[in-house]
Every structure is written in structure tokens, then in C-alpha cells.
Amino acid sequence: MLTGADRIAADGSVANKVGTYGLAVLASHHKVPFVVVAPMSTVDPDTPDGAAIIVEHRPADEVTRIAGKPVAPAGTSAYNPAFDVTPPGLLTAIVTERGVARPVNAGTLRVLSAGSCNAEGPPADVYVER
């Protein structure tokens, strides 16, 4: 399964449209690879992990009204996040224009961000395809 990302934290956590996390859980349960495809500009090394990603909350009436008509009782509140966050443990890989980070973790993303590997190759716990 392929998906995009609006933001990727330094540890590989991915913020994307609501529903991405649920799809990743299902893919993991059914042993289907779950791959994020996004440009390197999406990776934010200053955001350490998924908990640090600020998730925008949309107006409640986006889900309590349809075409201007109420679909919930008056005064009903609604939790309406614009994104959800998928932890790196549910991802098979992150594909960027610089290569493929697999497994998804801070080490593989650092190697991709650096743009090159040393002559001996990446450390043993880091695997990056170019």
C-alpha cells in the first residue's frame, strides 16, 4: 500500500490525512507492506517524533453538518483533526527522491538527509537504497 505524507518527524513518524493510521494498522495486521512516498522537504528534523507534531483541528461543523444541514443534534461537539500520526513501526519504508529508508527510523532518515553514505556504507542498523 502506498500513501503520501504531509510531514515526517525525525524518528519517521508520519502525519497525513485522517485514516492513514488506520490503514497502516490494517496493512500491518494483514502483512501488507505500507510505504510512504514523499519529498525530502516533508522530513522535519526539528520535530523529534510523532508526539511533537502539532495536528490541526478543523471546525466541528465540517462533520456535524452536510451541505449546510445538521446531521447531529444541536450543540453536538465533534473531534475533527485534519491529520493523524502513524508511528514508524507501522511503516515498511519511506521513499524519497534521495532513496528508500528501510527500516524507518531516525538513522535511515539522517542518512537520506545527508545525501550520501560513507565509503564503507551505512552503519549496520541503517539500510538505505539509492
Which residues make up each language-model segment?
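Conserved phosphate- and dinucleotide-binding cores of soluble alpha/beta proteins
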Residues: 1-130
